[in-house]
Amino acid sequence: MTFIIHFKDGHRETYSNHYDEDNEHERDAAWDDAYMTFPNADYIEEF
């Protein structure tokens, strides 16, 4: 899955991980992974 990570200072990054987005449990794991990888993110959105 691919995410856009927004930070409080205004910059953004893209982040991709290798989870199956068609599987609900793996989608949840992908979101958890993104939040754990970027704990200081202001907002994370799916791309």
Give the location of each predicted region:
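A short beta-strand micro-motif
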Residues: 1-8
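Assembly/interface hotspot detector across virion components, adhesins/toxins, and nucleic-acid enzymes
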Residues: 4, 15-17, 41
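A short, exposed loop/beta-hairpin motif centered on an aromatic-Gly-Thr core
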Residues: 11-25
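Short, mixed-charge low-complexity intrinsically disordered segments
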Residues: 31-47
